[in-house]
């Protein structure tokens, strides 16, 4: 599901103006990004949590030339599914 599809579904389900739903979805995502960029964890009970994981510096490889490349350490977003989400998805199999 894309952001556009989510906005469309919410618009139809709750009979709200598309612009209002779009603004709300964008604001929710922006608040999550701001929290993560400040090093905070974002938890949505029953769904999951977003946090930052540190990737240590390492020597990578340029795929085009094969030459070694020094890669700096960095923080990357990480998502861990909540128990309820894992259980609901598990019933699909």
From Swiss-Prot:
One of its GO terms (cellular component) is chromosome. Transmembrane segments: none annotated. The keyword Ligase does not apply. CDD domains: IHF_B. Keywords: DNA recombination, DNA-binding, Transcription, Transcription regulation, Translation regulation. GO terms for biological process: DNA recombination; regulation of DNA-templated transcription; regulation of translation. It comes from the Bacteria. One of its GO terms (molecular function) is structural constituent of chromatin. SUPFAM superfamilies: IHF-like DNA-binding proteins. InterPro entries: Hist_DNA-bd, Histone-like_DNA-bd_CS, IHF-like_DNA-bd_dom_sf, IHF_beta. SMART domains: BHL (SM00411). This protein is one of the two subunits of integration host factor, a specific DNA-binding protein that functions in genetic recombination as well as in transcriptional and translational control. Belongs to the bacterial histone-like protein family. Heterodimer of an alpha and a beta chain. This is Integration host factor subunit beta.
